[in-house]
Amino acid sequence: MELKATTLGKRLAQHPYDRAVILNAGIKVSGDRHEYLIPFNQLLAIHCKRGLVWGELEFVLPDEKVVRLHGTEWGETQRFYHHLDAHWQRWSGEMSEIASGVLRQQLDLIATRTGENKWLTREQTSGVQQQIRQAMSALPLPVNRLEEFDNCREAWRKCQAWLKDIESARLQHNQAYTEAMLTEYADFFRQVESSPLNPAQARAVVNGEHSLLVLAGAGSGKTSVLVARAGWLLARGEASPEQILLLAFGRKAAEEMDERIRERLHTEDITARTFHALALHIIQQGSKKVPIVSKLENDTAARHELFIAEWRKQCSEKKAQAKGWRQWLTEEMQWSVPEGNFWDDEKLQRRLASRLDRWVSLMRMHGGAQAEMIASAPEEIRDLFSKRIKLMAPLLKAWKGALKAENAVDFSGLIHQAIVILEKGRFISPWKHILVDEFQDISPQRAALLAALRKQNSQTTLFAVGDDWQVIYRFSGAQMSLTTAFHENFGEGDRCDLDTTYRFNSRIGEVANRFIQQNPGQLKKPLNSLTNGDEKAVTLLDESQLDALLDKLSGYAKPEERILILARYHHMRPASLEKAATRWPKLQIDFMTIHASKGQQADYVIIVGLQEGSDGFPAAARESIMEEALLPPVEDFPDAEERRLMYVALTRARHRVWALFNKENPSPFVEILKNLDVPVARKP
């Protein structure tokens, strides 16, 4: 059927369209120069209007677009409209049946996902959301019309409501699921560890997100959560033992985790590995070779000897090298360098050896060619860094030569090789669940290894337990942003906070928490204590009072109670400890650097060396251009890592902490602690 404008109507209307033709499932409007096809699946409404003389048809399309036909005889316009409308409505009724079926399928999908007795992940809800939106975009009717049809209206509204409140629906489902699991598995959560898990620990264990960061403050029971998580996966049948990968950062920590797993879960089929042991396993399986880790990796003296020998050789044989090294050590490091053959000076050799060791290690950790290292350095230091790299290149070459002679690899090389094998698909990961301890210590290289494992199976979950307040190993490559920006680096997921510490009292917690959270770059989290502490639980004391303090402790400390003396550097070990065995024979006293004390605890902690200066705490920034270019960027907040080191020291104690300071040259931390209402005692 066709409708045309009258001759006069056409002339007066001056409109691009003057006729319309009804098609099988649409309408075509056209004029002398223009033609427009309107499929019914884009048509929202048809309006028939009468002007002063002629009729007018109006076709409403999406995005507020309207197509009009003017100048038609009114009677013919009415007849055409009624015929077109009946045809369109008939077509719409048929299409509504199809749309209704599609909508019901979407409701079934929602019901299936939300009805499952399992955690609903963000990834799953995003997938459902995407699937529903794709289904809506493929409907034969415009979604704006679905409210018109009785068979579509309710289903459409339910789909829209779910899409609108998708996050609250997910949270509601997971809350109900968690409560059900905590009730159903109450015995498991009571018995899986030596003490029952608290609600925050149990909720972290139950959380089924693909990428989960568990922030575990000092003494909050992170190991219990890792063990319980492994046990939970087994109890729920979500994984077999060989599908669970448990990672620790040191061999001792891995061995302790193994023992805990055997003791609590009664299985030897789950083995905790270090990242290096994992890399070794991947290389063995993926290349059928058994790489040998160089003896040099565990022999500091031999490494130092190797680097100093090569350094002396370069300086003695090449004037340019000698000149470059003299300039580096005097201008940048501000060291006193002897005249003449400075490379033969034994004191300088001893001082430089550990630096050369660290710098070669950083270059190996980077793993790229010299040009890549230089290109990745900040622009403002790139030229100078390029000169330093050229001076270091022979030492790196000597290191590689030593490895080749030994037919061995180093730790950095292990991880690089493992990543290459994974990326080439020569090793297929069997692990569905990766659990990582001390996640805050992760470096970009180790993060790349995790990413390569998860890339092979997008459903592999990452359960990362750590504490950004205790990131103290930047010199080993630890990058705090991998924890603080966890989901940007490891995909969308969740965060759980373990909110109770079983170690220290409320006063130690209050001081330590306020001290660390003055840095806005640290994640905010609660950490509550089970015991109260008085004002003196943290006390500032003059360093001259150490003997008097130990005298006093000898009067009331029980034989089984441990006293831990902590310092920023090993050479700050107090001379008083030389006589400890005879003067305080009943006291159980240990000395450690704060770095070494990580993971330790004691009844009483004495922090020594709170002074300013070259051996001060906080330590003065003494990075060379090598660290600046090859390590993660230094944070903007002053003494950020040193502040975290102080937090670690404070939180080793159960009952009391004494911070001993130099009255003549006190550490800046002393004033900060005073401002946190920490009292200064004249005597213990």
Can you annotate each of these PLM segments?
Residues 213, 220-226, 492-494, 500-587, ...:
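Helicase P-loop NTPase motor core
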Residues 1-19:
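Anionic N-terminal interaction surfaces
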Residues 444-535, 677-681:
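Conserved RecA-like helicase ATPase core segment
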Residues 143-170, 174-176, 182, 234-408:
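A basic/glycine-biased coupling hinge at the interface between accessory DNA-binding modules
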Residues 127, 136, 140-153, 160-218, ...:
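Conserved helicase NTPase motor core
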Residues 23, 33, 37, 44-52, ...:
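P-loop NTPase Walker
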Residues 433, 558-560, 587-588, 598-663, ...:
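Conserved helicase C-terminal RecA-like lobe
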Residues 210, 239-243, 458-460, 467-469, ...:
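Short glycine-/polar-rich loops that comprise or flank the Walker A/P-loop
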